[in-house]
Every structure is written in C-alpha cells, then in structure tokens.
Amino acid sequence: MTSCKTLLTLGLLLASAAAPAQEYRPGSSLFLTPWPVAQVTVPFSLSATGTQLPVRWGLDVAWLNEQNIRKGINFIGRENLGIARSSFQMNEPLVGDTTLTKAQQTMLRRRTAAINLISHSLDIVLNADQGDGSSQYINSYYSSGNRANPERWARLIDASVAYMQEKYPAHKVVAVSPFNEPDYTPWNEGTLANFKEIAKLLKENYPRFENIAITAGNTLNNDHAANWYNGVKPYATWGNTHQLAGSFNSFANFWKQVVDDGNYPYADELHNVGEAMIAVHYGMKTGIWWGFDSRARGEFCRISNHGTRLAYAENRATWTAASVYRDDATGQAKAFVGGSERQANNSTYLFLSPDRDVYFDGQGPLRAFRMEYPGGTGYQTGQTNAERVYNITSGEDVERKPLTAGEYKIMNKGTQGLVAALGTDDIVQNCYTPTATPRKQDIWAIAPASDRIGGDYSFYTITNPTTGLHLNVLNNSTESGANVIPYNAQNASNEQWYTEYAGDGFYFIRNRESGLYLSLRANRKVSNISIVQSSLLTGANLDRQLWRFLPIDAPTETTAPAAPTGLTGTPQSASVRLNWTASTDADVDSYTVLRADADGNGWNTIARGIAATSYTDNTCRPGTTYIYKVVAVDKSLNASEPSTTIQARPGNDKDMVASWQFEGSINDESANMMDAVSPEAPAYQTDAKVGAQALALNGTGWLQLPYEVGDMDEMTIALWAKWTNNSKSWTRLFDFGNGTTQYMFLTPSNGTNMRFAIKDGGDEQTVDAPTKFPANSWHHVAVTLGGGTVTLWLDGQAVGSSTGVTIKPSDIHPVLNYLGRSQFRTDPLFAGALDDVRIYNHALSQEQLRDLISQPTGIASPEAEESRKAEPLYNLGGSRVPESYKGVAVQKGRKVVRR
C-alpha cells in the first residue's frame, strides 16, 4: 500500500474497521485506523520547541536549462535562494595561456543570464564542466589520460573568476570546485594529487583566491568523499560530495567529519529531498539542486529557512528518511519523505502525533498516519527518485472532507461558477443557478498520481471522464497568465496538480510543472471566462484562485446553514458525551465538533462528518476541563456559525473505562465508546469464558484501541486469555505505547516468564511472574498500577509485584494501543483467544479482581435504587434512557441490570 493508495483506501480501512458495529456509533473510533506495522516511527508535536536548521539553498546552471531555473524560483521563492552553481570549461586552451576563449566567455555569459533570473547579485560557485570526459570537453591542454596539468588548470580557473569579477561584479564568486566528480575516472580530469596541487597553486600563487574557498572533491560516490576531502587539506575548506552511489553511513559520517573539523559542509548537487534531509541533519549548510523537480523540494527549502524541524527519522537499510517541519510564521506543518536517487528501497514510516489530532492531506482526525515509500530493487534498478510532502493541518478550520479519488464539480469562490472543458483548446468557467444539473463537461475525476510516476508524487490528476482530457498548462509554461486547456499529454508534469487548503472549504490548486495557481482570468463577465495559471493574487482578486471540490449532486452556492443549538455535555468515566439540536436547514450533511482548552485557547477539530446529533469524545484527558462547540456543514461544504460553547470534563470517580465482551462485536460496551478496530474482519469462537463468544486471534490479526484508553496515572488492565502459540516468545496480550522507546506491555513469555514491562525513553522497568502464562486453557490475568506498586495477577492471585516501577502510563501518553500486537516489528502476533477485556482508571484490589472473575456474564450485579439515580443511564447503543428503563443498560461506564 503506497501513500497514494493510502489516500484511496483510507475510507475502506475505516469502513472495514467499523463493519462489525451494529449501529452508527459517533465516537473517535470512526477515525481510528489500524495501520499495519511500519519500519520507522516519526513522533512529533506541533507545539514542540524543535530545532532551527536554516540552509543556504541554490540552483545549478552547470546543466543549463532555463525551465529548471524558473521552476526552482516558483517553488522555492527568490527570497530563499542565496547561491548558484555555474561552470568553467576546459574545452579549449587559454588564449596566450591567460585569457578565456570567446566560446568560454559566451558560456559564462549564458549561464550568468540564467542566474540573473533569480537575482543580479547572487553569490556563485564555479565548478568544472567536464561534459562526458571526452576531448570535446576536456582539451589535452589541461589533462590527458586522467593526468592534469595543474598550472594550466589553475590559470583557467583564475581567468574564469577574473572574467566574472570584471563583467558581473555584483555576483560574488565565493568558491571554486576544480574537478567535478573526480572519483569517476571516465571524466578524465586528473588525480587526487593533481587536485591538491591545483588547490595549492590557487591559494598560494593567485591573490584573488585569498577570500575564495576551494571545495573538496564533489565525488559521485560518497564513499570516496572523505578521501577527496582529507587529501586536499589544508587548501580545501568546503567539504563536498554528491550522492549518486555509496553507503548511508559514509554519507552521514562525511558531513559530521566536516563539521567536526570546523570546515564548511556544502553539497553542490542534490537530487532528492531525502538526500537533503539527511545532509541537513548531519550538518550541511549550503545545498544546490541539480535540475529541479517541484513541490517537495521547494516546500522543504521554504520551511527549513522559515521554520523549525519537529522530527527526523531515517532508515539506513533502505536509504530513506523522513521529517516534520513547522513554519513558525504561519503555523503550517509539513511532513517529508525521500531517499537516495539511485539506491532507495521500499520503506514504511508512521508519523505519530501523540498529543493532538491532526489531518494529513485532509485525512483525519488522526494521531497516526502510515505511508509507504516506493523504492527500487537495486542500484538504478526500479528506482523512480521518489519523494513526497504531506500537508499537516489542525485547528478550527481544517479540510471539511478529505479529497479522495472520485468525481467532483470544481466551483470558484468569487463567481460560484464551475470549471468546464469546452472543446480541446480552452477550459472556461461557466455560471449556473445553484440547483442546475451539471453537464458532462463540468465533471472532473480526481485521482492521486501514481507513486511511480517519477520523482515527486505529491499530486493529483484532474480529468474529464467523458473526454479523457486533463487540465493541462499550455506548452509547459512556467509563466503567469498561461492558458489552461483540456489535453492529453499522458499525465505529464503540466497535467499534475496539488492542493493547498485555504480555509472555509476552499483550496488553491497549483501545477507541478510551474508551481503557479489555477486562476480565473480577470474579466467582468460572469460566464465563459478563460482559466489560466497565475502567481498568487491578493485582496479581492484572491477569490479568482479559490476553488471548492463539490459532490456532483451538491448545489453551487455559498450560503451557510443555520447553526446547531442546545449543545450539552455529559461527563462519563473517560469521556464527554455531547448532544445537540439539529440545524434547521434541510441540506445539512454533517456536523463538525471542535474542542479547546478551558482557557479558550487551542481550538481543534476533533471530529467531522458526524451524521448524528451526538458525539462521544473519548480523546479527552482525565481530570481536564474543555470547551466544546459544534458546526453544521451542508452538502456544498458551507459551514454554519458555531453553536454556543459549553464547558465539560470527564468524570473523576474511580470507575471502569472500557469493556470489550466480543459478543460478535469489538465495540466497547461502556458508555465511553472505546470501540476497537481491526485490520481484518474480526473472528469469534464459541469456546468463550464469558458470554457466548470470545475474540479468536490466529497469529495474523490484532486489535487497535482508542488513543486515550491508556493515558492514566493509575489503571488496571484485566482480561481472560487462552494462549495457543506458546512456543513463541514475546507475543503480546497487550502493548500500549508510541513505538519502541515508549511502551507498556504484557507478554505471556519472554522465553521463561510472563512479564510486564514499561519504558519511557530510558531504562525498561519490569515485573516478572515466576513462570510463563499457562497455555491452551482459559486463565484470567490482570496488571494493576497504582499507589507506587505494580502487580501481576493470575486467576486472582498475585504472581509478581514491584514498588520499583516509577513510570506511570500517563508519562508515556500512549496512543498506539494494541491487543495481540507488539510495538516491535519482529515480535510475533498473539495466537489464541481473548474475552472480557476491561480497563479501569484505578488499581483494583484482590477482592475486586476476584469479584470480577466471578461475574460469568461480565455484567455488574443489580444496583440499589438509591445508587441508580446517581449517574445518567444509557442503553447499549449509547442513547440516554429514563430512570424507568428496564433490562441491561450502561451506567458509570459499566453494564448493569435494571429491574
């Protein structure tokens, strides 16, 4: 499953996870996704201090391509470009051993003209243009048989710098690279000794190089970088390498060495955002892009210079890396993933936001998001140079629906007109009345680009399903004002688009080739207005660039529905149940639930698309007061004003938090709706300990529990288990955590003993039973944590205890909470059966555990009349019922019999 496929299948995952439910249950488990195991976890917090790692970014004109420069400017922004790489040529002998030839001067002028598109006063590094290494590019005057003439080579470099200083004094030459990829002998430049001698001559015999740096050999294979750096000391002070071959270890270690030496870490030919992330992590200060792809690189350059890195992770075995950055000016956050251009392998990353619900490219609310990076099978085999960026959004105004694959109308904000394909030479905007039926030319199929499309795959294709023609920027233009037409260029880069959420349900739509914005041409007409691409507009003109993706049957209108009313919040043992009165508008499609801290700060969208007038918030933390409000959203994605706000908090009593009885369902039977989700259809067996059925796990399945189910100072986890794969060690009965550095788990066997372990980044703290968990028969097991003591219980008897466990579950704040699965990739899944799994927010006593074990139905004993009225009462569907209700109900988070 690739990240693109993730976009397509998220809804399917959610649907399959919810499939066992017998009714619509509006709680956080609607959004809980049971992601498969990932190789690397990337935890981050949007509120973290983070690390600022600014980089001097640049573009390359050694490969002279004006389109690359224009793309780089549009995506990176001129303000973020501080350097460029140009080239001197060895193709002709110097005139009189001192002066550049006309052809050499012409190429410097052409390259400088391209640099001038960025700025007329940009710093420049001059690099050797070796071409293909033939005599056409390297004249024997300079080198022959891979042996250089250092004196002539030095004179050539000096003459090239002198020409630039004379003709372009505003461009400062700050460094020179005597050879390009010198470790690749077919280039026929010269030896390491030749390189050092050239550098020595420049520094000792040419005064103009007193303040111009010499870069070390920019090796093709980074395994050779240290040799071509150490071998040119002390004359070369800029460490430099490419990453077209070589190990991850030597790449990282090279940058660390340059930094440790007090020299300048410089990469003059970057090919992938993954390579850039890794180099930045280990110290690179200046990076120049060879060629230029588009979005991921541009956004990484922008945010790295204006923001803070919140997380970084790498997979050296697959030559990939990932990171999360926050723009400190706008608050926007982005996740990046990339790898080696020629050596990356398939890899998986799980981005984890333990303390806040977020949205990844509009998917959410989520605390965890898994993506798959598409690598190759060997060096330059199956490689696509893949890279990807995700928008991470949160707050009061997030995407109102995820933009998944499907058919849409695209409505402009300013005119409420629709994008329409007319003929084969123009795309225009037509205006319709709000209820008009769209024509075939008004419908667009949105699909994520293939992750193997080549390079950056952070895009969509936008296609008219009737004609098969795509939104296409005419002639691959990178200029503002270029027409957008219906065409079929086989999903080329000028037919790929990406979205940026702009608020109020509207998006910017930007082109991969140009980075410019889909826009209505300025026109007083209200229909048949041509659509173009444009730079970002301002003021009232901005509406011409704002678009909304509407369902085909939705009206084209922007009138907000009436707000919901009567919002109430009922405290429960580990949740707040919200109820409200529906909006009076008939076309209201769903509701959005927002929550803030008690002081009114930090509003966030904790649920959206709710097709009911109630919601159970079980992502609230114990003992914490919140403010809530609800918004109505209609079919056209217009949002109402919010309801009046209320204040609420979960209850403070010692009570049950969740109960999973597995009677044909993995739903929680408490009022907290801590419903589990499964990556496959759950299986049940009649060999049960409590009730008629138990959850059957065959070593391939597992359950994921809601994010906040284990976030407590004290707790009890109690369950019945029948363990059948007893030949395997390190299976899990439960494992709550955030990866392999934060967890608490119970394993039936570590090889010799049943063990409870808890870890919060430091040393693991454990409690062992004297033996393994008994196999092939039902037994009750519990872990109690509280009062400074952790105890393991088996069939109501304490079998292990410790007062030396100082870590509390709330210290970990676990969100990856599993039954039958480990945080560790290599640990086997549990095989056997589970029944009557319960979690309490306090440590049960031995007497309470024995009472629990003796309840064969999993239902509490009938309560006295006076205790009945103390707390609200709910039926098993979660709806509140009157005190006169008879039968099995839920009160204070547990089942009770009402007589």
PLM segments and residue spans:
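Extracellular fibronectin type III
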Residues: 633-652
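Conserved aromatic anchor
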Residues: 574-588
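Beta-strand-rich modules
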Residues: 617-638
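Extracellular glycan-associated modules
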Residues: 402, 651-680, 685-849, 854-855
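Substrate-binding and catalytic surfaces of secreted/luminal carbohydrate-active proteins
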Residues: 158, 162-174, 185-415, 426, ...
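Lectin-like carbohydrate-binding module/patch detector with strong preference for beta-trefoil
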Residues: 398-557, 677, 702
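Residue-level detector of functionally pivotal "anchor" positions at catalytic/ligand-binding pockets or at interdomain
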Residues: 553-567, 649-654, 845-880
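Substrate-binding cleft and catalytic face of glycoside hydrolase catalytic domains
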Residues: 43, 60-222, 226
